[in-house]
Amino acid sequence: MVAGGFPLVNILQTSMNSAMVIVSRNGQDPRSLKKAKVATWRSGFDQLARSVVSGRGLGSQWIEAVYPVNLFVAGAVDATVAMTYNELLLIRQAGFDPSPESIFRFRDNGYNIQEEGVYMSRSYYLKNKDRADRFARASRRGWEWVADNPEEALDIVMSYVKKYRIATNRIVQRLMLQEVLSLQLDSS
């Protein structure tokens, strides 16, 4: 967005590590699959995955879906883009146990692009520095509280899961939380 003339300011970076992976079905390194069908989100958050795979000249076909995990589990694609705290857990929950060779972790291969930041327009930031700082500090304190009180945090999440009848369970939410918290640690 900055290149498009819309300057942004990052006021809080919660994730220090990339959660993005590509998972292949057949135990091979996803970057070696020629003419593979690769499932990805329709949201446009897959530019890094597309550029890494496309740069290898493998002729991959990108299949956009609202929920690419379903295509992967059904065997309709050879690989899928996933996040370690979400889709990778769902793949495992569906009974797949991907080998380490079949998971390309961007963070471990020179593409550790930080995710999950809080941004605002530069003009808003310049007019509201104190408010932005207070928001960032409160958000950080919230994450610190969650790290110190994971079961209480899960109680809160599960109350909303029950209220809004969301299809998940405490075990999945605990695994997601553990992964999200691990991504917040600086591994460098």
Predicted segments — roles?
Residues 57-60, 99, 165-168:
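Secondary-structure boundary/capping signal
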Residues 1-4, 41, 52-56, 71, ...:
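Structured segments of extracytoplasmic/periplasmic soluble domains
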Residues 127-188:
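Secondary-structure end/capping motifs
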Residues 29, 45, 87, 131, ...:
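Short phosphate-engaging motifs
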Residues 14-23, 97-125, 132, 136, ...:
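Periplasmic-binding protein-like
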Residues 1-65, 69-85, 104-106, 112:
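Short, glycine-/small- and polar/acidic-enriched structural segments
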